[in-house]
């Protein structure tokens, strides 16, 4: 054969092998088990993304019956695990998120026979809908296919089942997000100006516990009083009173929020004498909801989904 013919044969062989591999990864292997039964004796482990918000969000999920534990940190080894098992074409956030979960399993911090893995999904604005398939692929490499993968999502995701939180759970998640946004805004401002380093973090720890309790209770009427008390507590911290340049941090959501993913950019900005500003997590969720409305208006997308998004925004 000529060199060109040999290369063409090789290309066809590689394409066939890749197609067969993808089909094998995506087709169901067993009869689906109801989610309640599947997770009856399992703890659901969630990867870290937003250190201020996620402890409160986990408390909200616990109040609706799901035992959710947050992985504590992103070790350098976790990122190495992500690089090892996630395709190089995937984005860096996928490597960080999946690497956290794989690292916990490989270090035996998580018992694979009594655990499940949780991924949060946007269902539209980015490639995060691919994460469950990438994670299941990595689990197969590690011979851990028995570990369930579940999603916290506004729609159906191939390769994973979706946690059902109901309207009560949705209300609690919204409250958790608002508490987290308030804490984030206040803590970043005070950290940039505090005279005694650590004052802001002590208030964050205190108010995280209060916010987790309030979000779990689902009492929306309490939020306004707590927000005022939160502002009073943070502004009672001794501060330098100087006006500093405010530096906005923008970009992919995980990279913005997680210190291990953004190389500690928040602390670096503070050390340079400026005040970091992070967008609200609630604003990101509103963006996701408006995406459904735009899809219906511009591209003829599902109107029912757009109506649901409009009601949630209201």
What are these model-predicted stretches?
Residues 1-314:
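An N-terminal assembly and electron-transfer interface module characteristic of large anaerobic redox
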């Amino acid at each position: 054969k000529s060199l060109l013919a040999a290369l063409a044969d090789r290309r066809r062989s590689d394409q066939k092998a890749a197609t067969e591999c993808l089909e094998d990864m995506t087709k169901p292997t067993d009869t689906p088990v109801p989610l309640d039964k599947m997770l009856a004796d399992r703890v659901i482990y969630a990867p870290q993304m937003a250190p201020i918000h996620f402890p409160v969000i986990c408390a909200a999920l616990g109040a609706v019956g799901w035992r959710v534990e947050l992985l504590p940190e992103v070790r350098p080894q976790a990122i190495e695990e992500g690089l090892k098992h996630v395709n190089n074409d995937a984005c860096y956030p996928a490597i960080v998120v999946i690497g956290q979960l794989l690292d916990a399993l490989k270090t035996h911090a998580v018992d694979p026979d009594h655990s499940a893995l949780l991924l949060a999904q946007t269902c539209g604005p980015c490639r995060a809908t691919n994460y469950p398939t990438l994670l299941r692929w990595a689990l197969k490499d590690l011979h851990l296919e028995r570990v369930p993968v579940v999603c916290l999502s506004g729609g159906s995701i191939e390769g994973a089942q979706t946690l059902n939180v109901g309207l009560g759970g949705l209300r609690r998640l919204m409250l958790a997000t608002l508490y987290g946004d308030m804490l984030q805004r206040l803590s970043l401002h005070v950290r940039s100006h505090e005279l005694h380093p650590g004052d802001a973090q002590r208030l964050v720890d205190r108010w995280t516990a209060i916010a987790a309790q309030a979000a779990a209770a689902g009492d929306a009427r309490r939020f306004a009083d707590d927000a005022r008390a939160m502002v009073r507590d943070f502004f009672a911290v001794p501060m330098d009173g100087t006006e500093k340049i405010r530096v906005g941090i923008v970009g992919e959501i995980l990279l913005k929020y997680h210190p291990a993913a953004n190389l500690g950019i928040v602390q670096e900005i503070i050390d340079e004498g400026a005040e970091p500003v992070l967008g609200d997590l609630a604003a990101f969720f509103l963006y996701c909801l408006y995406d459904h409305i735009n899809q219906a208006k511009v591209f003829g997308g599902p109107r029912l989904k757009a109506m649901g998004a409009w009601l949630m925004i209201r």
